[in-house]
Amino acid sequence: MLAAVAVLGGLALLLTAKSEGTAAHAADGGRAEIEAFNKKYIEAHLKMNNAAIMATWAEDGVGLLPGTAPMIGKATIGKFLNDVTSRMEGYHMQKVEMDFQGISVSGDWASEWAYEHQVVQPPDQKPVIDSYGKLLLVLHKEADGNWRVTREMWNQGMKP
C-alpha cells in the first residue's frame, strides 16, 4: 500500500513538474513573440511607415494620448496618424529607441511598458526634435497568430 502511495505521489510530482515546465516554455515562447513584435513595432516607427504601424493595431484598438479624447478603432487611429504625418513633409526620423520593460504574457494577452526616445530632423536645417516619453501597450494575439495593439497609452517623459 505504501509503495502504491509512493508511486502515485511520484507520478503527481512528475506531472506537476511537466505542467510547470510546459507553462514556463509557453511563457518563454510568448515573451520571444512579444520581443519579435517589438522589433517590428520600432522599425515601423523608425521608417515612419504608417501602413506598417497600422498593421500592428487591432481593429478595435484604443489610443490614449494626453490632452485628447480617446481614439477608438483602427480607422480613427490611422486617420490621426495620417493627419499628423501629412503635416511633417520633409521630416526624417533619425532615431527611435524603446526600452521595453515588464513584459507579461498570459495566454493570448500581453502587456508591457517602455521608455521611449525619438530624434526627428525637420527640413531646412531646423534644430532636431529630441523627445522622450513613456509608453504602455496591451497586446492581443489574434486568430491569424499575430500580436496586435489593443490599447496604447503614451505620455511625455523627461530625458533620463
Label each PLM-derived region with a short phrase.
Residues Y132-P160:
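Short beta-strand edge/turn micro-motifs at domain boundaries
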Residues H25, P123-I129, K159:
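A short acidic/glycine-rich loop-to-helix N-cap element
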